[in-house]
Amino acid sequence: MIAQPPIQFDRTTGVLQGANPWERLAAVALLAGSKVSSLFSHRGYNACANLLRKTLSEREIAVRLNDDAVFVFPYGDGYWSKLLNRSFKYEDELELLFQDSAGIDYTLLDCGANYGYWSVLVSSRPFGAHKAIAIEPSSVNYARLANNARANGGRFQAMHCAIGAARGTARLSGTKHEAFSIAGGAGAGGEVVPVIALDDLIDDGIVAEGGKYLVKLDVEGVEIEAIKGGTRLLRGDTVIMCEEHGSDPHHTVSRYILEQTPLKLIVYDPASDRFETLTELSLLDRIKVASHVGYNVFGTASAFWEDRFHRMNANAARRVH
């Protein structure tokens, strides 16, 4: 049986093409569900969308993110179908940094890339056409990541491995494609995957020591191990972007960055529309309002990137006045 071509959706115009009547009705439901559930941080949306997906034929959707970026995923996917809602912004605080950095010569290290959303976007012309290296441990996710690299002209590199403290292997476990993890240890079962450290990328000649890097660490519970494995990379002109879990009242990742590394800890505060440099963690108690959501925090030892955050704050102040 020949696979059907992907449904096409343009986030700029809202035009949906190539869908049959039932798929169009499903799109209406997915859009409405996103708008309603956005009022409570999309709680329950993924599960409801995945139930709806069971009624659909297996098919992909190609979402045009901008005039130079196409992101392909299974139609009805609970995690990514929020993109059908044109007002939805995925990890808005990361997009602010990437947009502001369009004119800077940096490389994105997209660790835990999933299907490659950020690599697709950052390598596109409106975001500066940057070099991106997308790193994903799951073989199932990696196949979709590689497909997105091909769909965008092969302009970013995809690597099939996990990020940890040192080179080796680990077992990848989990039931949700957006939450596979090597944190369970050798007894967790699941797929055996290669592991590399961030500094191995320097040793292997994949990245150069002394460049500018934005490092997204979406590594599901091994953020601290990943930071430990990137000592050389992180002491240069690098920013790490880590997920601070809403369900963690101790702010474990942020606490480690603040107390155990030379990095400055920075967080985006939606209330002030500013990136705040933290010397203690009480602000996170206010920002982390939903236990099922991840909140990105930033760490850097770079005066260059610190200045960029200050510039973004100045630009935000000008927008208000």
Q: How would you describe each model-predicted region?
A:
Residues 109, 135, 161, 215-217, ...:
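Active-site flanking residues adjacent to catalytic metal/cofactor-binding acidic residues
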Residues 86-109, 157-158, 167-171, 177-236, ...:
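Short internal loop-to-helix segment that lines adenine-nucleotide cofactor pockets
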Residues 1-139, 143-155, 203-210, 270-276, ...:
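S-adenosyl-L-methionine
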Residues 128-130, 236-238, 261-263:
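A short helix->loop->beta-strand "cap" motif at the edges of active sites that frequently abuts
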Residues 139-142, 146-177:
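Core alpha/beta nucleotide-donor-binding catalytic domains of modification enzymes
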Residues 113-115, 139, 163-165, 219-221, ...:
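Short, glycine/acidic-enriched loop or turn micro-motifs at the edges of active sites
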